[in-house]
Amino acid sequence: MNAPAKFSTSQIRSDFLAFFEGKGHTIVPSAPLVPGNDPTLLFTNSGMVQFKDVFLGAEKRSYVRAADVQRCLRAGGKHNDLDSVGYTARHHTFFEMLGNWSFGDYFKKDAIAWAWELLTQVWKLPADRLLVTVYHTDEEAFELWRDMIGIPESRIVRIGDNKGAPYASDNFWQMADTGPCGPCTEIFFDHGDHIAGGPPGSPDEDGDRFIEIWNLVFMQFDRQPDGTLVPLPAPCVDTGMGLERLAAILQHVHTNYEIDVFQALIGKASALTGIADLENKSLRVIADHIRACSFLIVDGVLPSNEGRGYVLRRIIRRALRHGWMLGVRQLFFSKMVPTLVELMGEAYPELVVAQETVARALLAEEERFAETLDAGMKIFDDVASRSQEIIPGADAFRLYDTYGFPVDLTADIARERGMRVDMEGFEFAMERQRETARAAGKFGGGVALPADLVATMAPTVFLGYEAQDADALKVVALLKQGRPVDRAEAGDEVIVFTDRTPFYAESGGQVGDSGQLSGTDISIEVADTQKFAGQFHGHVGRIAEGTLKLGDVLSGGIDVQRRGKTILNHSATHLLHAALREVLGTHVQQKGSLVAPDRLRFDFSHFQPITAEELAVIERKVNAEVRTNHSVEVHNMAMQEALDFGAMALFGEKYGERVRVLKMGGYSTELCGGTHVSRTGDIGLFKITSEGGVSSGVRRIEAVTGQGALDYVAEEERRLGEAASLFGGNSTEIVDKVRALTDRQKRLERELESLKAKLASGATADLGASAVDVAGVKVIAVRLEGFDAKALREAMDRLKQQLGDSVIVLAGAAGGKVALVAGVNGSPTGKVKAGELLGHIASQIGGKGGGRPDLAQGGGEDGPALATALQGVPSWVKQHLG
C-alpha cells in the first residue's frame, strides 16, 4: 500500500479553495466568530451558520455555488468542547471547517463525484483506505457511491435511525424540529488495524481507527409540524470537512496536535515554559487556546464577566492555569501571538492587522489574573485537603467571586485530582447573588402596551427628521396608570399615542423629546417620549387642561432648545467612536451610550485605562473633524448595501431590511436612527470631562459639546484662577508652586518622622531598667503616650536588642484609642507566644489582635482596664513559662 503524499495545512486550504473555484464556486470569506444573523447562537460553530438565512429563504445571494474556510468555536453554550481540549486527540475550542455549498444548483451526483476527486486525485488518498456511510433509505446516494465511484458494497455502511426517533440519525441532518432537512453521506478514513476501533455503525465505532473527514448533507425536504417530509423545490448541498483532522491524515500523524500548525505552537509554548516534553497535555491546551483567544479578539470580543467576553476570559484563564501547573510564574501567553500570526496570518489577514491589539488584550488579562491565581490555588489546595471527593459549591463560588476562577476551571483542576465540584451548590450560591443584584436593581416596573391593543395599531410615523412641530396628530391610544382608557382629565398623568409625531422616542442612547401637545381646549405637557413594542411613540406627560379622548386631533411641538443640545451630543458620539477606533484600535466597539441635552456618555470595549496622552489625541481628532465642518449625509438603503457602503453596525443590535446610514465626511459612517446636526461644525466644541472603567473590558468617556463645552472650560479656568490666587500667583505659575509645595511637604514629613524616632528613642532609653525578672526572662509591659503602631514597633526592636531574652508589651495611647505591640525574644519563644499574649490583653480592653509567635499587634479602647491588663502581664508570662 502506497503512503499518501504529505501536505501542509496551508496547502490543504489553498487546494480546497482552488479546486472548488475551478468547479464554478464563488470563494466566500470566513464569517466572524460572532454570528451576525443569529442572536440565539453564542459563536459560529459550523460552516453553515453564515448561510443559514439563505437555506431558510430569508436571504438571496448573487451566487448559487460557494466554497469557504470558516473559522469556528465550540466553547460555551450547547456546543462546548472546552473540558475535553488537551485531553483527547481531536477536540479543540477553535477549528477550521472546509465547506462547499449549492443553493438549488448541483446535487448529490456532483457533490459526491467532486469530493471523491479532491480526496483521491488531488490529495492522493488511497481509495482502499476510504469508507462511506449513507442514510439507510437513501438509495440514490448508495448507488452513486457503488456504481459511479466504484466503492464495494462492503465499504458502504447504511446508518438507520439510531437516536430513538424517526429521522433521528447520524446520517439525517435537520436544522430544527421543522424546516429544511435531509440525508447525509459521510466519508471516513481508515487509520489501519493497528488502531483500536470498528467501522461506523458497529459497537466499536467510537474507537480511533475510522475517522470521519467529510460530511455531505443533502437538504431535499421541508419537515412539517406533523413530522411529514415534503420535497423542496430546489434541493441544496451543505458539506463540511474539519481542516485539522484532514491535515492529520495528510501529514501521516494520528492526532490533530501532531500537525504542523500545532507542533509550531506547542514548540513555542515549550520554549516559553521550559517544558521539553512536546506531548505534555498542558502545552496542548496552551497551543489550542491561543488560537481561540486570538481570533475572538480579532472578531471584537474582549474579556469581561458576561456573555461572549466571559467565555473568552474562561479560555484565557484556563491556559494561564495550565502554565502555572508547569511552574511558569512569569507572563507568557501573549508572547504566543507572533508565532500564531506567522502560521495563520496569510490565510486570515485580519489577524495580521489586529496583532498588536490581540497581544495587548491578552497581556492585560494575563496581568489581571496573575494577581489572584497563586492565592486562588492556595485556597483550592486548602479546600481540597478538607474535602473527600467533592469541592463544595460554596467554595467553588468563592473561587469564582473572589479570585476570578471560572467554575469550569475549578472543575478542571478538581478532575485532575479525582474530585468533582458540587455544581448544584455552586448554582445555588450564584442564584443568591443574582437575587441580591435583582433586588438592588429594582426601582419600579415598566409600562407595556397590551397585546390586544398593539394588534389594532399601526407603527407611529416619525416626522421629526424634518419637522419640529406638526398638526393633525390623531390620538390612537391612551394609557392612564398603565392601563388603556378612552379619556383622561386635567391633572392626570398619561401616555398618549398618536398616529404621527415629531417627538423622538428614546432609543439608540438618545433621550426622548419633551414639549407640548395641544388641541381645542386641551393642553398636555410632554416630559418624555418613550418607544413601546419597538414601533410606537408614547408621549409621557400630564394633562394641564381640558379632557383628552381617543380620536382627538392634536398639534405637537418639541422643546426645540432641548433637542438642539441633544443632537450636538449625538453627532459628537459618532465622531468620538471613530476617533477611539483610530487611536486605540479597531477592537473598540460601542457598548452603550447616553445622549442627553447636557452631556454625552459613551461606553466602549477596551482592555486598559486610556492614558492622558491618548485622551488628548482623541479629543483633538474629534475637534479637528468639527472644524472641518463636514456635511452630514443621511442615506436610506438595504442592510447589505449599507455594509457594502462601509457603514459600521453595532454588535447585538437588531436592524430591519432597510436602514438609515449617517455619514460625516470620510471620517464616520454608521447605522443610526437618531437626530443629528446638518454639519459637524454645528457641534462647536467637544470637551472630554471624564474617563473610567465601567466593568471589566468596558471603559466610559463622558463629554460635553457646544455651549456646554464652553461653559465647562470657563468653569475650569475659574477654578484654576482661584487655586492660583490661593498660592499667591497666576495660573501660569501654579504648576511650579504646587510642585514646590509638595516637595516642602515631603521634606517636613521626613523631618517629622526623624523627630518622632528621636522622641521614641529617648522615651524608651530608660525602659530597660524597669524590666521585671520572671524566671530569668525580662518582662516589660508599659503605656507610652502619643506612640502610634509604627513608633511602637521601632521601640520594640530597640528593646529586644537591649534586653536579650525578654517578653515585651507596649501600649501607645492617643485620642481614646490604644495601639498594642507584643514581642517575644530569645529563650521564651517556644513557651510564650506573642499572638496569644496580645489577644489576652486586647480582650480586656474591648479590642482584638494577633500575629506571629515572636511579634503581634492589635488595638482597643483606652481606659482604666488598660493599666490592669498591663499589670497582669508578668504573672501571665510566669504561668506560661511553667
Swiss-Prot record:
This protein's record includes keyword Zinc: yes
Pfam families found in the cross-reference section: DHHA1, tRNA-synt_2c, tRNA_SAD
Signal sequence segment: none
Cofactor note: Binds 1 zinc ion per subunit.
One Gene Ontology biological process: negative regulation of DNA-templated transcription
The protein's Enzyme Commission number: 6.1.1.7
Class in the EC hierarchy, top level: ligase
Essential cofactor(s): Zn(2+)
Main location: cytoplasm
A GO term for molecular function: tRNA binding
Compartments, record wording: Cytoplasm
Binding-site list for Zn(2+): 570, 574, 672, 676
Catalysed reaction equations from the record: tRNA(Ala) + L-alanine + ATP = L-alanyl-tRNA(Ala) + AMP + diphosphate
Keyword annotations of the record: Aminoacyl-tRNA synthetase, ATP-binding, Cytoplasm, Ligase, Metal-binding, Nucleotide-binding, Protein biosynthesis, RNA-binding, tRNA-binding, Zinc
Gene3D superfamilies: 2.40.30.130, 3.10.310.40, 3.30.54.20, 6.10.250.550, Bira Bifunctional Protein, Domain 2, Threonyl-trna Synthetase, Chain A, domain 2
GO cellular component, one term: cytosol
InterPro entries linked to this entry: aa-tRNA-synth_II/BPL/LPL, Ala-tRNA-lgiase_IIc, Ala-tRNA-ligase_IIc_anticod-bd, Ala-tRNA-synth_IIc_core, Ala-tRNA-synth_IIc_N, Ala-tRNA_ligase, Ala_tRNA_ligase_euk/bac, DHHA1_dom
Domain notes: Consists of three domains; the N-terminal catalytic domain, the editing domain and the C-terminal C-Ala domain. The editing domain removes incorrectly charged amino acids, while the C-Ala domain, along with tRNA(Ala), serves as a bridge to cooperatively bring together the editing and aminoacylation centers thus stimulating deacylation of misacylated tRNAs.
Reported function: Catalyzes the attachment of alanine to tRNA(Ala) in a two-step reaction: alanine is first activated by ATP to form Ala-AMP and then transferred to the acceptor end of tRNA(Ala). Also edits incorrectly charged Ser-tRNA(Ala) and Gly-tRNA(Ala) via its editing domain.
Membership in a protein family: Belongs to the class-II aminoacyl-tRNA synthetase family.
Protein name: Alanine--tRNA ligase
Organism of origin: Xanthomonas campestris pv. campestris (strain B100)
Encoding gene per record: alaS
